[in-house]
Amino acid sequence: MLASTMHLVKRKVGVFSRRQLPRFLSSLRPILISIEGNVGAGKSTLIEELKRRNKNWNFIDEPVDVWSSIKNEDEESLLSVYYKDPKRWSFSFQSCALLSRFQNIEKAMRSVTIQEHLCKDEHSPVFITERCLDTDYHVFAKMLRDKGLIDTLEFGIYRRLYDFLRSSMTIPLTAIIHVDTNPHDCLERIKLRNRTGESELSVVYLQSIEQCQSDWMSSLQDVSILHTGSSSTADISRIEAFVNSQLVP
């Protein structure tokens, strides 16, 4: 079926309206794979290596630049004030994170034109995202609600936003690659990279994330999951084989 779709595209590239494009992209059966893991787990390092080795894949970075660019009158970023005062800023930050992640994912899917994809690959398009909307809701928002940092009313609003954005996604989540790193090791990496706004993080916070991630992934039934502990050559090869196993020939 994909071969016949490709033949049709080669004849009709450029005739699709913006409204028609998501439906047509679905006919190409793209896959969306999320790189999951704790803060400081090594997700970015893994993604950079995958980028270097797989030029045909489409990578979607976590929108940290958006969170860092929104600043108050004291030039403190949203990310920074969230870590400093989570009780005050958890709802604001998590809402921004959810919306900006959705925008990044949808923008990436629309930026890969049909003509460009056909020139690169005969397989289904591959999109690799650093975390996904489900992580925002099932891991971070629920964790903050359980800690009392997002109240019941705020969580109700957040859930409506999540439900709307998730139902608006061009394609659903296909699979997860989980970078499984001990929270203590994560904290050491966080200290070494010295990223703005992260100095307030504690091992207790990282352990809470780890537990929520475990609970969420254990509940998944229709999403394939690969657990990995590093970005070694052997692990990279295993990850690439896992991604390729999700492709529709």
Q: Where are the regions a protein language model picked out?
A:
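Glycine-rich phosphate-binding loop used to anchor ATP phosphates in small-molecule kinases
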Residues: 89-170
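Conserved lysine of the Walker
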Residues: 43
